[in-house]
Amino acid sequence: MGELPKDDWQMNRWKWDGQRFEAIELQGESLQLSNKKGLDLNLPCGFNDVEGTPVDLTRPSKKVRSGSPGSGGGGGGNYPKCQVDNCKEDLSIAKDYHRRHKVCEVHSKATKALVGKQMQRFCQQCSRFHLLSEFDEGKRSCRRRLDGHNRRRRKTQPDAITSQVVALENRDNTSNNTNMDVMALLTALVCAQGRNEATTNGSPGVPQREQLLQILNKIKALPLPMNLTSKLNNIGILARKNPEQPSPMNPQNSMNGASSPSTMDLLAALSASLGSSAPEAIAFLSQGGFGNKESNDRTKLTSSDHSATTSLEKKTLEFPSFGGGERTSSTNHSPSQYSDSRGQDTRSSLSLQLFTSSPEEESRPKVASSTKYYSSASSNPVEDRSPSSSPVMQELFPLHTSPETRRYNNYKDTSTSPRTSCLPLELFGASNRGATANPNYNVLRHQSGYASSGSDYSPPSLNSNAQERTGKISFKLFEKDPSQLPNTLRTEIFRWLSSFPSDMESFIRPGCVILSVYVAMSASAWEQLEENLLQRVRSLVQDSEFWSNSRFLVNAGRQLASHKHGRIRLSKSWRTLNLPELITVSPLAVVAGEETALIVRGRNLTNDGMRLRCAHMGNYASMEVTGREHRLTKVDELNVSSFQVQSASSVSLGRCFIELENGLRGDNFPLIIANATICKELNRLEEEFHPKDVIEEQIQNLDRPRSREEVLCFLNELGWLFQRKWTSDIHGEPDFSLPRFKFLLVCSVERDYCSLIRTVLDMMVERNLGKDGLLNKESLDMLADIQLLNRAIKRRNTKMAETLIHYSVNPSTRNFIFLPSIAGPGDITPLHLAASTSSSDDMIDALTNDPQEIGLSCWNTLVDATGQTPFSYAAMRDNHSYNTLVARKLADKRNGQISLNIENGIDQIGLSKRLSSELKRSCNTCASVALKYQRKVSGSRRLFPTPIIHSMLAVATVCVCVCVFMHAFPMVRQGSHFSWGGLDYGSI
């Protein structure tokens, strides 16, 4: 072990080249990326930006923790001080333990101390402060650590199996040579599964391959014990998915004197399941178990229906179906065919385990991987076996599953193949392999979205299934400083990733050396790295002297591996309950050099120990949180009132990462750096991260919306392209590929980003321009495939169409790419498409105003596959105004004049739109007012009081009666009859 450095290195003394992975020591200079660095954020929300503060969930062991002195708080030059409020104890001369954890000796032993305006106590095992409520009275360790300690004392250690084997051997000293052979075979199995480093005195030596073959020859004829046969039968019945199927093994056969299945059959299934390293042994097992006549006679179960069968081709072999469901071989198959199909089926749907699998076997495609997690019995990430991981226990007592497991279960329920419902058989507490026993499971994971990766570029949707997935790999190098990193570090990491990365960018920060590498790879490459991390770390150590002599941690997604003194340990399952999750950062794009306010939204952002940083130009800068908000929708908000990115390049394009971490665990979000116009366009994407009509239940759902993953993929790809704008391609990785340009161009057109599409086209032309000043054939074929101009016409985006039509590869040569006459499928051109689209007068005007006047001259002559011209398309769709517009332009061109279409002194089209919008607003206003008054009237129920209505009715009745009486001819005693017609007029 090397000597510990005297002082932890400081950020302002080093300049890190994130592209070359090289460190340059500065002389009297300081590299500042932000106006906020080295901040000690003692906020109530739990932020404390002290780089040396340990996080118990990320360190695999107390012995693997950093031995270097504590940093000065994120790169500052001050010596560390005690983090207790009002404690000014200088820790520069204190012990290394107190310097690392920022606590003086007095407060580390005190029963209570005021930290962050809260009374807390220093935990001796966590090496951090907790609230007093987390401690039992008088205890120096928190209850969580004490519970783990008690569980470790009661838990059986992994070496107990070897001890039991030795005890069994010592106890049965009178056993015959056959039992000794069995013990030797079990010892070989244990050693083959990664436990050969822990040999116990007195245990039998590991037999060689020839000895194993001899042992198999001896014990292949041994019958299985009756109790083991019944146990296999019972587990097979429990694992069967269809309960109506008959039992594969009749228990009455044993009572009738039928011979039990041969031990050879069990070993054959075992070898097929575990993947024997000896090809001769596999051939021997398959031939001896299924091709040999004597073995078949011993294996065949007694049946009255087949007692007369003597031919080997007619023999019916029956074996209990451990995967659920009885399976009987067909009598029409030859022995060799049956053996091949039987072995293939066994390897794909049978997982017969004696012990937990070796980590080396996890990379085999036909062997399932065992579950690794942080053991409650140890702080080291080791491979543990838990009773709850048994498939039978999971079948009876299902636990809370992750979204990926739920997707797999849904897929498994809809499958009709009996092989997908297999259940592994565990004889000695083997860990769960059910998740990977299904051969379609890996295919399902690659088709699911996170990786976040994939696209068929089918318009108009923004799909990202085939795109590169951007992820982060973190290394923590103990007892190192930047000067000790080799110059070949980038090459070693690139080769370690099997040359899969399309892009890589690195950042470093103190805490020994925390090296963060952002990598763009395919989803399948990420899956291989996470599933085979142990083998990958082993290959990294073997191929590099620097890594073999280093003590380090590596975090790749869901797994954490550690290397110390040549030993590699792996933890596959982390406790993800309190992991931070960044949903979005607002704004999504910023202008370099301009100060802006930043809002970070996500989940679990205010937990204890979280740190907010900005990664840019190879280094980290701490960010000061000025406000926080914890909503009822489980979405937290962190506010950064003053955020500024300083660009070291004159080019205003780039990308940085906003990181929220707790040790090596955390989440990140890309932040685009561009000019003001592009930033304004990209910031419109925030609506897709915060839909206004999303209800609380949807926000709380752990499955994030698909659109978020698609937009995130778009931002990551755009960030990689912008980063290459100011970095030279001298590192050996391939240039930005055409499929990646294809994805960005389609997304930009579908989102109506005119400024962004021009910038992306400039970068594509710059990389694919030939010596003759023209684009190469591959680029032209790609542009013809995605048909950007047709997409703009479908969206009726006239501004985007004008941008594309006037775009030239070289302005001096006027070499235009997007012509209005370029033919697509069926010889359909943009002119035909626009002519058949309604309300596209502006689009027709733009297409016929191209710089070369191709659209105007081809309107009446350009035909498609059916012989129709754009003029015919417009006439068939009753778009006669299009033909009138083109005819007027042609007449003006012939006469050398310019005509203006003025109707009633104003633009009729614009007027109709404005009037319709105003009328619509007026109608809406009137409707709302009418509804308001209607509600008021309906609330009072009567317009007038009841007495007034009665009086009016009485007066009206009297008036009607008088009028009727006067209009009739009543009989009067004196005088003539009165009639209305006899009345005259005159003065009164």
Curated annotation (Swiss-Prot):
Cofactor: Zn(2+)
Chain intervals with Low complexity compositional bias: 368-379
Localization: Nucleus
Zinc finger (SBP-type): 79-156
Keywords: DNA-binding, Metal-binding, Nucleus, Transcription, Transcription regulation, Zinc, Zinc-finger
Cofactor note: Binds 2 Zn(2+) ions per subunit.
Cellular component annotations (GO), alphabetically ordered: nucleus
Gene Ontology BP term (one): regulation of DNA-templated transcription
Residue stretches of biased makeup (Polar residues): 250-262, 301-311, 327-358
Residues given in the record as Zn(2+) 2 binding sites: C123, C126, H130, C142
Residue stretches of biased makeup (Gly residues): 69-78
Start and end residues of each stretch annotated as Disordered: 52-79, 240-262, 289-416
MF terms in GO: DNA-binding transcription factor activity; transcription cis-regulatory region binding; zinc ion binding
Stored Gene3D superfamilies: Ankyrin repeat-containing domain, Transcription factor, SBP-box domain
UniProt main location, coarse: nucleus
Protein's UniProt name: Squamosa promoter-binding-like protein 16
Gene: SPL16
